[in-house]
Amino acid sequence: LSLHEYMSMELLQEAGVSIP
């Protein structure tokens, strides 16, 4: 993963979005 993708996933998790 790129740094941007990793940070985006972290933000989604913080927002309460489940990531498969």
Curated annotation (Swiss-Prot):
Give the CC-aspect GO terms. mitochondrion
Domain ATP-grasp: start-end pairs: 8-20
Where found?
Mitochondrion
EC numbers listed for it are 6.2.1.5
Reactions this protein catalyses: succinate + ATP + CoA = succinyl-CoA + ADP + phosphate
Q: Name one GO biological process term.
A: tricarboxylic acid cycle
Q: Which keywords has UniProt assigned to this entry?
A: ATP-binding, Ligase, Mitochondrion, Nucleotide-binding, Tricarboxylic acid cycle
- Copy the pathway line from the protein's UniProt record: Carbohydrate metabolism; tricarboxylic acid cycle; succinate from succinyl-CoA (ligase route): step 1/1
Superkingdom of this protein's organism: Eukaryota
GO MF: ATP binding; succinate-CoA ligase (ADP-forming) activity
Q: Provide the top EC class.
A: ligase
What does the record note on quaternary structure? Heterodimer of an alpha and a beta subunit. The beta subunit determines specificity for ATP. Interacts with ALAS2.
Q: Which family does it belong to?
A: Belongs to the succinate/malate CoA ligase beta subunit family. ATP-specific subunit beta subfamily.
Report the protein's function. Answer: ATP-specific succinyl-CoA synthetase functions in the citric acid cycle (TCA), coupling the hydrolysis of succinyl-CoA to the synthesis of ATP and thus represents the only step of substrate-level phosphorylation in the TCA. The beta subunit provides nucleotide specificity of the enzyme and binds the substrate succinate, while the binding sites for coenzyme A and phosphate are found in the alpha subunit.
What is this protein called in UniProt? Succinate--CoA ligase [ADP-forming] subunit beta, mitochondrial
Origin species, per record, is: Canis lupus familiaris
Q: Which gene encodes it?
A: SUCLA2
